[in-house]
A protein has these predicted regions:
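Catalytic P-loop NTPase motifs of RecA-like helicase/translocase cores
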Residues: 154, 182-183, 209-210
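Short amphipathic alpha-helical interaction segments
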Residues: 2-14
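Conserved nucleotide-binding/hydrolysis modules and their immediate coupling elements
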Residues: 77, 183, 327-391
Length: 391
């Protein structure tokens, strides 16, 4: 498309008020024009306004200067925080709004668990939430505290969210995990429902891919300079034993991952690792190896359910190594012929794992939730899916 045509079209949309434009100065002082769809423009402005509202209000509970609580909690749980972890907990006591960011294995979960134990005696109403059911389930497992999805916290329904500025949340402390996954629209709805006197802690990895929806909320909040930020960069010993963690940090630093330990035919007696690299360039052979690994080698070595505990990721839909072809091959191998239903060139069978791809507020099932087909009726074209435990 010719750039002049594109600019002309944008100008016309701006005149018709179908787009919004905002002028800003970038880091080098050069003025730039940002173009938004109106609903995202309004949502982004409300996010900023609500952050300022919460920051500039008195908290329900004041912890300022009570740093002795940290040492008491350390003795209570038998844990010695490292200096940066301690800085994060001190900041949580001192500030109304805080961002804690760090890569895998840097102790984010440990800090959340520690803060919950420290603050709960003084703040009985604490809300812990994440953008997806799987993320919320993971928090519950690692902290021992009940967590929910943001949608469930806001009491989502087909009529919208029941919690808002007029009917705010009850919690005095709200902790959001996996904040990098939250898009501008959802953050807007969430912050609208946060009471002015509540404390807010946003936890996440700013170096992860941004949300699927519009916006890079966590990054923008950090770069705004208005919210205290604690960055965790130390990989703890247990995490340092994980090849996934080590290689994730290598990729982040622009380094080549450690491929020194490859899966070999004679590795039956070798120690179990969480990261392997298999070198292969032939697409058909890649599929063969994926099938072998997912249905035999890895489930047997690690005692995993090949369907519910295993996930194959691919960057494309089409082609031999695309998701459509791989799903068919995996289905044939893991869940062979039975009662099935065909829809849009996709064959569904009882026992298949499926993923919800859009929010269903009436059924309280949300985008990204995983379930398993428990019944299908080819005559009525109906599938019955049992989703994981409600969170």
């Amino acid at each position: 498309i010719d750039s002049s045509m594109l600019e002309s079209s944008i100008r016309q949309l701006l005149e018709d008020r179908l787009l919004n434009c905002e002028k800003i100065e970038d880091a080098s002082g050069i003025e730039q024009e940002l173009v938004y769809r109106p609903r995202f423009y309004k949502a982004e402005r409300r996010v900023a306004e609500n952050i300022f509202r919460i920051l500039n209000s008195e908290a329900y509970t004041n912890f300022e200067g009570e740093f002795s609580l940290i040492e008491e909690q350390e003795r209570k749980v038998g844990l010695k925080l490292d200096p940066v972890q301690k800085e994060a907990v001190e900041a949580a006591l001192q500030h109304k709004v805080l961002i804690i960011t760090g890569g895998p294995g840097t102790g984010k979960t440990t800090i959340v668990r520690f803060m919950l134990g420290l603050m709960r005696p003084r703040i009985p109403s604490i809300g812990l939430a994440a953008p997806t059911g799987r993320a919320a389930k993971r928090i519950t497992e690692t902290t021992g505290a009940a967590a929910s999805t943001i949608h469930r916290l806001l009491e989502a329904s087909n009529m919208g969210f029941q919690r808002d500025r007029e009917n705010p949340l009850d919690q005095e402390l709200l902790i959001l995990d996996e904040t990098s996954m939250i898009d501008t629209t959802l953050m807007d709805y969430f912050l609208e429902a946060v009471p002015s006197a509540s404390r807010l802690i946003l936890v996440g990895d700013v170096d992860q891919l941004p949300s699927v929806g519009a916006g890079a909320v966590l990054l923008d909040l950090i770069e705004s300079g208005t919210i205290p930020v604690v960055r965790l960069d130390h990989i703890f010993r247990q995490a340092a034993d994980s090849f996934i963690t080590v290689n994730a940090h290598k990729v982040r630093r622009g380094e080549v991952p450690d491929f020194s330990r490859l899966i070999q035919k004679d590795n039956a007696e070798k120690e179990l690792l969480d990261f392997y690299f298999i070198k292969e360039s032939n697409p058909e052979k890649i599929v063969e190896k994926i099938l072998l690994m997912s249905t035999e080698r890895i489930p047997q070595r690690f005692e995993l359910d090949p369907i519910m505990d295993f996930q194959v990721l691919t960057p494309m839909h089409r082609g031999v190594t695309g998701s459509l072809h791989l799903n068919r091959k995996l289905q044939e191998k893991m869940n062979p012929a039975g009662i099935s239903l065909e829809h849009r060139e996709q064959l569904f069978r009882i026992g298949d794992k499926v993923m919800q791809q859009q929010n269903d507020y009436e059924k309280q099932v949300f985008n990204g939730d995983l379930g398993r087909i428990v019944n299908c009726d080819p005559k009525t074209k109906e599938l019955h899916v049992q989703f994981e435990q409600e969170i």
